[in-house]
Amino acid sequence: TIPDIILFEPSFHKDQRGYFFESFRQDLINKAAGYDVNFIQENESKSNKGVLRGMHYQLAPFSQAKLVRALEGSVLDIVIDIRRSSNTFGQHISCELTAENKRQLFVPQGFAHGFVVLSNSATISYKVDNYYSPEHERGIAFDDEDLGIDWRLTNNIIKLSNKDKNNPVLADSQDLFN
């Protein structure tokens, strides 16, 4: 486990009509994070089975914290600590986010984030606390052997963007966090 990464497992109430749950409470996010997180934008992406997006992050002054959840389908979500001064530098966590389990993953600034789609398709929503800046965007190779990430790819067929195919391994990455 990496203490700064927070997995929210909301309780939801089901009955004959369907279900209800609080999908977002700013005060609970702030309390769990230990500081005021100011989400300013919400993004949504839809991907098909085998699509791998990651491992992405942005440098200051556009670094981003994220709150990620699956609206449809399921993904294996991965987060890597890329803060050089951290005791958990280079370590990662993985968890399955599904539309059914309604888990949400809080990813603070200073971490690389990515996911692979496990279901036929998946729709992911993520709130961010800073705007996208292409000049500040960076990535880490998803298949960096030193990280030892198990992507649970049974057939080794993945779909990557050209940009993600060219990300450096962590050891060769110059632009990280202190």
Where are the regions a protein language model picked out?
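Non-catalytic, conserved peripheral segments adjacent to functional cores
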Residues: 1-100, 119-121, 128-178
